[in-house]
Regions:
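Glycine-rich phosphate-binding "P-loop"
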Residues: 64
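Flexible, glycine/small-residue-enriched loop-and-beta-strand segment within the central core
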Residues: 39-42, 48-49, 68-80, 84-149, ...
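Residues that flank catalytic or metal-binding motifs in active/ligand-binding sites
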Residues: 107, 158, 168
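Terminal amphipathic alpha-helical/low-complexity segments used for targeting or macromolecular assembly
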Residues: 1-61, 135, 153, 175-186
Length: 186
């Protein structure tokens, strides 16, 4: 097994890989987001940022987190100034997710840091980090797979599946995502 894959050891594929105290903290997080944030209007963004910071999210400047965004494990999320996590976007942060300055994750996009080791009979959980570069744009319903780095100023088209890194200034789309152009910046 590749040590870079960061497997979380499970005794059984039918049990959580997380210790009981992490499960309690995750339950508190889900309850808090539902009660204190999910219903809030757009201008309550500073309140949502505060709640995320209380649960360990690393947020700098003024990122925007939509009230209907889903964040699995907030202490694995880093967002920089002007980064945006859109409506119903899903940061499935079993591993680290880093969204740099000015990057946009559009509605219903899915950043997935977790998968399973299909060569292991117990299907061990494997996590790999995701990084979205400065001023990158992830289109609606796009899926970014574990371990992917989206380069600065890159664009991922709507409903694309991205299984590998996207270099700076590239435009990709499709399943699997393929280069369809270059993005120029002024």
């Amino acid at each position: 097994m590749n040590p870079k894959l960061n497997p979380k050891r499970q005794k059984s594929p039918y049990q959580s890989p997380w210790p009981w105290w992490t499960q309690v903290l995750l339950s508190c997080w889900r309850f808090s987001w539902l009660v204190f944030c999910r219903w809030t209007p757009k201008f309550f963004n500073p309140w949502r940022i505060l709640v995320l910071k209380v649960f360990g999210a690393n947020l700098s400047g003024m990122p925007f987190i939509h009230s209907k965004a889903r964040i699995q494990i907030p202490w694995n999320l880093t967002m920089k100034h002007r980064a945006c996590l859109g409506e119903c976007a899903n940061a499935y942060s079993l591993g680290k997710i880093k969204i740099l300055e000015g990057a946009t994750i559009a509605q219903e996009a899915y950043l997935c840091t977790g998968t399973h080791d299909f060569n292991d009979p117990s299907l061990q959980l494997i996590t790999k980090p995701i990084m979205v570069g400065k001023n990158a744009f992830i289109g609606a319903r796009a899926m970014i797979l574990p371990g992917v780095c989206i380069g600065d100023h890159s664009i991922v088209g709507a409903m694309s599946v991205v299984p590998k890194d996207v270099p700076n200034h590239q435009i990709v789309a499709g399943n699997p995502a393929q280069k369809i152009g270059e993005r120029t910046t002024s």
